């Protein structure tokens, strides 16, 4: 089935009709601190997109950048380099800071079951292409040099700012989050290359035709995209906060460099809201994955919470909401565990084979419904609701419910199969009357020192995947 996504660029839904080599780029973290769960809501949305594309049969080439230089504290053209600022405060080098927080970011991604990109593009390792892009733009007379820095002249790009709202420019207003800079020709111009840093001892600098300096955040993403994906990008991901400045600047750089349209589809995820504000490091109102773990939450409790809301809707975060998601996720695992432990060996064997080998029409109808929901703008929240409908259904067998749950989990990534097995290892198996009779026979055999018969009964259970554990309270049956 063809995936439809809401395209911020066109303000309409776009169909992805090319199933071969879908090029996807996501704005990754600026590695000066731990990523917070507001950041991870966006990365979970990106993860859902990549997994949905692959689930539907698209061949995906997925890249993410790591910003280890040039992202200023103001997110614009003012302020100090965030990584350099943290390095100075902690008495470490910028390389030590960026390496530490990059590793921390991907460790948290693993805990949240966020897919690892096919290519990770570290900004400081791609300086030559950034310089080359600026040189080409300079040759086209799209840049100017002012106060030691190279600016992009937005008046040379007639469609500048369309994705954010062209009316802002028509009214000679400043776009959201853009400050006044007396060295700019136009209010919307932005720096491509800094040689005149406001801060002494800027550690990360490179030689360039304009002097020793460093690239802007906007140049980094555009240039690395052009280097890795060449002249075409299919989908660009990011948070809604990137629309008003960063992504329109990327579009301007790339399309002036290429002399043609660059990326057709931009997809943006909404904020995670806490105390009526977006979660933000600069505001000081942020929570990390480790903070959740310290309060006895699983990172997958947070992932479940994210699955309950569409990516284009703001999601309110509170400990109460997270606790509700924790309870719901545990209830889901408990119900699926009950189904699983009730299966006979034939059904268990079926689950280990082709999951999509559906036995009857009702099962296939639920599967088709799930595919339809995720194919229309990643409506995973409706897919999760459908999973609960399946669990409560009287028209499906236990093996059908489990099969559908495991299929859905290829995208939801709640580790359902693993969590079920872990759950069953920690809980006694519900046994029927025949099993109870055999356990009692084994108890009597052991009392009568008929160890041969006792071992035969033990081996009988073992062949069915059960382990008998003798305790003071009696014999318990557990999954092997």
Swiss-Prot record:
Binding, ATP: 281
InterPro entries membership: Cys-tRNA-ligase, Cys-tRNA/MSH_ligase, Rossmann-like_a/b/a_fold, tRNA-synt_1_cat_dom, tRNAsynth_Ia_anticodon-bd
Listed GO CC annotations: cytosol
Domain of life: Bacteria
Cofactor(s) required, per the database record: Zn(2+)
Subcellular location(s) per record: Cytoplasm
Cofactor note text: Binds 1 zinc ion per subunit.
Catalyses which reaction(s): tRNA(Cys) + L-cysteine + ATP = L-cysteinyl-tRNA(Cys) + AMP + diphosphate
GO biological process terms held by the UniProt record: cysteinyl-tRNA aminoacylation
EC number: 6.1.1.16
Motif interval(s): 'HIGH' region: 29-39
Cited Pfam families: tRNA-synt_1e
Name of the top EC class for this enzyme: ligase
UniProt keyword ATP-binding, yes or no: yes
Keyword entries, A-Z: Aminoacyl-tRNA synthetase, ATP-binding, Cytoplasm, Ligase, Metal-binding, Nucleotide-binding, Protein biosynthesis, Zinc
Binding-site residues for Zn(2+), renumbered to this chain: 27, 221, 246, 250
Any one Gene Ontology molecular-function term assigned to this protein's record: cysteine-tRNA ligase activity
Chain location of the short sequence motif 'KMSKS' region per the record: 278-282
Major location category of this protein: cytoplasm
Quaternary structure, from the entry: Monomer.
Sequence similarity: Belongs to the class-I aminoacyl-tRNA synthetase family.
Identification of the protein by name: Cysteine--tRNA ligase
Organism name: Borreliella burgdorferi (strain ATCC 35210 / DSM 4680 / CIP 102532 / B31)
């Amino acid at each position: 089935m063809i995936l439809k996504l809401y395209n911020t660029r066109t303000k309409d839904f776009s169909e992805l009709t090319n199933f071969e080599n879908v090029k996807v780029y996501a704005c990754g973290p600026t590695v000066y601190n731990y990523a917070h769960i507001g950041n991870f809501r966006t990365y979970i949305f990106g993860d859902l997109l990549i997994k949905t594309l692959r689930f539907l049969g698209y061949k995906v080439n997925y890249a993410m950048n790591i910003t280890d230089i040039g992202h200023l504290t103001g997110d614009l053209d003012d302020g100090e380099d965030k990584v350099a600022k943290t390095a100075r405060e902690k008495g470490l080098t910028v390389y030590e800071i960026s390496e530490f927080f990059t590793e921390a970011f991907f460790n948290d991604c693993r805990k949240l079951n966020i897919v690892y990109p096919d290519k990770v593009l570290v900004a400081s390792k791609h300086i030559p292409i950034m310089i080359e892009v600026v040189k080409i733009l300079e040759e086209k007379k799209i840049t100017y040099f002012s106060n030691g820095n190279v600016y992009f002249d937005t008046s040379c790009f007639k469609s500048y700012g369309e994705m954010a709202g062209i009316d802002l420019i028509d009214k000679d207003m400043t776009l959201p989050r853009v400050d006044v800079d007396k060295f700019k020709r136009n209010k919307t111009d932005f720096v491509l290359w800094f040689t005149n840093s406001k801060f002494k001892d800027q550690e990360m600098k490179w030689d360039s035709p304009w002097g020793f300096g460093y690239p802007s955040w906007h140049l980094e993403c555009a240039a690395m995209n052009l280097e890795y994906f060449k002249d075409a990008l299919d989908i660009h991901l990011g948070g809604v906060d990137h629309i008003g400045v960063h992504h329109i600047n990327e579009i301007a750089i790339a399309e002036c460099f290429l002399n043609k349209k660059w990326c057709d589809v931009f997809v943006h995820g909404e904020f995670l809201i806490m105390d009526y504000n977006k979660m933000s490091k600069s505001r000081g109102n942020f929570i990390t994955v480790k903070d959740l773990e310290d309060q006895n939450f699983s990172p997958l409790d947070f992932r479940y919470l994210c699955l309950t809301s569409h990516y284009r809707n703001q999601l309110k975060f509170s400990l109460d909401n997270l606790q509700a998601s924790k309870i719901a996720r545990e209830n889901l695992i408990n119900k699926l565990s009950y189904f699983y432990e009730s299966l006979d060996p034939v059904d268990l064997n079926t689950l280990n084979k082709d999951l999509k080998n559906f036995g009857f029409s009702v099962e296939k109808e639920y599967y088709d419904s799930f595919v339809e929901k995720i194919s229309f703008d990643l409506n995973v929240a409706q897919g999760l609701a459908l999973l609960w409908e399946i669990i409560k259904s009287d028209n499906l067998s236990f093996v059908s419910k489990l099969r559908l749950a495991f299929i859905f989990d290829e995208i939801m990534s709640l580790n359902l199969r693993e969590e079920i097995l872990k759950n069953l290892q920690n809980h006694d198996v519900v046994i029927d009357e025949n099993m109870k009779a055999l356990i009692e026979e084994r108890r009597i055999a052991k009392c009568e020192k008929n160890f041969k018969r006792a071992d035969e009964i033990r081996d009988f259970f073992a062949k069915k995947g059960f382990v008998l554990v003798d305790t003071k309270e009696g014999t318990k049956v557990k999954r092997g």
